[in-house]
């Protein structure tokens, strides 16, 4: 009983860190997939697709009608992550809502998405303006 209690007390903090790490990795995967899906959908439908990121609410959405996007269309990201976006303000539907637009020809408006953990480590996703490619780099 004592040994089990000791093992639990030593393992509990690690489980919390493991869970945080898992959430971070899943959030990065979701954003990369969303950007790639937006690029693919723009090409397939012949209509521009926007990857919208609400940095204050830590959520994102894919849409081809960014002016009419509804709050319920957004997917949540972990609140513990600090998300910042460099984007072309011309394609943003409203202040405080970042948008990276993917065009049917394969290009995009370009931009960078930084996802930072509470520890300060993170990743930068760069969306190329010419080809719409998504690149990932540790920061």
PLM feature spans:
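N-terminal signal-anchor/signal peptide hydrophobic helix marking the start
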Residues: 1-2
């Amino acid at each position: 009983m004592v040994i089990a209690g000791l093992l639990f007390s030593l393992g509990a903090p690690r489980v919390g860190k493991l869970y945080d790490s898992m959430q971070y990795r899943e959030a990065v995967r979701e954003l990369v997939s969303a950007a790639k899906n937006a690029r693919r959908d723009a090409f397939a439908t012949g209509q521009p697709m926007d990857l919208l990121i609400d940095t204050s609410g830590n959520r994102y959405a894919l849409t081809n009608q960014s002016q009419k996007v509804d709050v319920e269309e957004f997917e949540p990201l972990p609140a513990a992550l600090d998300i910042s976006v460099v984007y072309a303000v011309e394609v943003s539907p409203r202040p405080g809502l970042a948008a990276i637009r993917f065009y049917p020809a394969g290009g995009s408006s370009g931009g960078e998405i930084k996802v930072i953990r509470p520890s300060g480590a993170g990743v930068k996703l760069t969306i190329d303006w010419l080809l719409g490619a998504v690149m990932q780099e540790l920061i």
